[in-house]
Each structure stands twice: as C-alpha cells, then as structure tokens.
Amino acid sequence: MVKRSQRVGKKAVEVNRGTWTAEEDEKLMNYVSAHGDKKWRMLPAKAGLKRCGKSCRLRWLNYLRPGIKRGNISEDEEDLIIRLHNLLGNRWSIIAGRIPGRTDNEIKNHWNTHLSKRSLTIDDLNNKQNPGLDNRDMLSPTKITQRSTPTHTNKNTNDELIDSWTDLPAPDFDLEQFLSLLPMSDLCPGSNGNDLELNDFGIPINDINQDSFRSDDYNVNYQEFLDSQVWSRAFEFDDIDQFLDCQAYGSLCSPIAGQ
C-alpha cells in the first residue's frame, strides 16, 4: 500500500492509496450509516480513515452503496447500454441512472473494454430480438399474396348439377325432373365435348332406350331405366328374401335401409 502525505488544515497527514481493505470498508459503512453520505472532505478524519475524501466517496458510490449489483453485466443490460449510448453519447451518469444497480464507472469501463469494439446499431439489436423480421426470412409481397389469396374453382352449371344429383339415393332420384333442369344443348345430338353425358351420372347408356331422346319432345323412358337399376342392385343385398320384400312394395330399398 502506497502512503502519501496530505495537509489537513495546518497538519500533514499520511493518506493510504491503493486497494481498500475490509477493515476500511467496514469503517466507511458504519460512519455513512450513522451520519449520511455528506461532507466527504471531512469524513475520513471523523471516520478514522487514512484516505482522501474523493477516495471515500468513490468507494461508497461504486462498491459499498446499498443496491449495487455484483457480477457480470447481462446481455439485456448490454443491449440497453448500446441503445442509451447511441442516444446520449458518453454521458455515463445519465446512462447509469437508467440501469438500476449499475454505476457510471462500471458502465464506462464495460463499454471501453467490450462494447466499443462492436459495431452494433439499433437496427442490429432489433433484428437480434426479432429474428423473424430479418430480411432473409421475410416473404416477398408476391408470395404473401399467393398464400393469402384462396384458390377458387369456377364450376359451370353442369358440374353443379352433377354434385347435387349424383349423391341422391335411388328412391329420391327423379330422372324426369333432373333432365328438365339440363340445358337443351346437353340432350341434343352433336353436342360438344364439354357437355354432359348420361354416364356422367352413373346411368348406363346401354340400359336406356336411346330412341326415347328426340329433339321434338325430349321424353325419357325412365321406367326401363329404373327396372335395370333394380336388378343391378340385387347383388348388394345379402339376403334375396330381403330384396324381394322391397320389390313387393314397388320401391328401391338400400341394404342399409333394410337392416
């Protein structure tokens, strides 16, 4: 420990310089707790310390004062220091006032030792906290539009008729009513490839009398069609008696309905 003489009034007093001891820290804390942190110039002599007033003040503010944090500065505190330094510059006392538990001397030393070597800006800190907003991860406006715009399939009238009529069970299928809803061009000979055909609805063409479709009346021999549907569905029944019972009532029964 280096000793140095200092004149206090008319007397020369030896002053210790260097590392503080635990005994000196205890004396300083006891005196400040009892008398407050005022009049630092007269404090060393009253507290029994061979230190100058400035050394006592810095020791108290930077190390012994209640509420001082110990340990390394966290990453969040570093980010806050960088943001405040970009706004305030080297005004360490003001910066320390906005970071609880850290002193201006500690923040200044940490900045000069570690943070000043980094070329981080506020934009870099924002990208660091929100990696999803990085330009490399952002979608282009075209991709966003493609994802947000639903794909709609335009169906013509014929497709809608297929969807609504082919799902009906056989007893509810009214062929005459269905054919009356179709455009006339769909039943006329020489129709183009985009028009409907009867086999699109599960109706076998070979089972229907084609002579029944004429351009003058468009009548359909649907009784023959229903008879053919009845015998073709006979194989769906596990019990032939069940099938014959359905025929006795003159209706098309499904295996599920008969059970």
Curated annotation (Swiss-Prot):
Matching PROSITE patterns: HTH_MYB
Keyword list, A-Z: Activator, DNA-binding, Nucleus, Repeat, Transcription, Transcription regulation
DNA-binding positions: 40-64, 92-115
Compartment annotation: Nucleus
Residue intervals passing through the bilayer: none
An annotated Gene Ontology molecular function: DNA binding
InterPro entries: Homeodomain-like_sf, Myb_dom, Myb_TF_plants, SANT/Myb
GO cellular component: nucleus
Polar residues compositional bias, start-end: 142-156
Domain HTH myb-type: 12-64, 65-119
Source organism: Crocosmia x crocosmiiflora (Montbretia)
Function: Transcription activator involved in the spatiotemporal regulation of flavonoid biosynthesis specifically in the corms of Montbretia. Activates the promoters of enzymes involved in the biosynthesis of the flavonol myricetin and the flavonol-glycoside montbretin A (MbA). MbA is a potent inhibitor of human pancreatic alpha-amylase and is being developed as drug candidate to treat type-2 diabetes.
Region ranges (Disordered): 129-158
Protein name per UniProt: Transcription factor MYB3
CDD domains registered for this protein in UniProt: SANT (cd00167)
Gene3D superfamilies registered for this protein in UniProt: Homeodomain-like (1.10.10.60)
